[in-house]
Amino acid sequence: MAITDPLTGLLNRKGFDEQLKNVMQGDLHIHCVGIQMDIDDFKFINDMYGHVVGDAALKSLAQDMQSYFNDNSIICRNGGDEFSAILVDTTEEETRKKIEQFTLQPRYITYNGGEHPFYISLGYAEYPKDCEDVSELIRCADMALYAVKLHGKHNCSPYRGAYKMQHRSQLGFALQDVSKNLPGAFLIYIAD
């Protein structure tokens, strides 16, 4: 079974999981930073400029990740516009500025002879500071990414333990807001 993404040449999720397992088997006391990111408004890029340009944005971001993060890093495309990375043998404190710079650096796609900017959002977490098991690391980084998306995109955020409760309550508020705006003939049932 393939372990690389055919479009970007990065690891796919299977390859990523295998590499991470190999790294962690060697040293359970290692510190690492997990990153989860995606391209802001990627559907708009595909709809506005076409899938060829969307693919170019994905390839560009993959190349940026490979050149920006060190050879010790494990980088993958999860699918769609989602990417994950594990920065091995480092801490959040050591990499915070580098992650911020990576997130905020300008990125462009070319369409009809013009350059058009595109942006990313990124969440990150540290093992073992933010989670007890490295398998939780990307989930924590994903919650941090979700928090960035809730507050305007094109930014990055470290994981905070409060994100778990905020994520749950945010989903509840969204359902409540939707139900308030429905005509009287609609009923919402919540299955237990």
For the regions a language model picked out, list residue spans one by one.
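Short helix/loop segment flanking the catalytic signature motif in cyclic-nucleotide metabolism enzymes
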Residues: 57, 84-102
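Alpha-helical scaffold within the catalytic cores of cyclic-nucleotide enzymes
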Residues: 62-63, 94-112, 140-142
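Residue-level recognition of strand-loop junctions within catalytic nucleotide-signaling folds
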Residues: 47, 86-90, 127-128
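A short pre-motif secondary-structure segment
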Residues: 74-77
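Catalytic-core segments of nucleotide cyclases and related cyclic-nucleotide turnover enzymes
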Residues: 51, 96, 127-157, 166-175
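Short regulatory alpha-helical coupling segments
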Residues: 1, 13-30, 62-70
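Conserved nucleotide-binding and Mg2+-coordinating catalytic segments in signaling enzymes
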Residues: 1-18, 37-51, 59
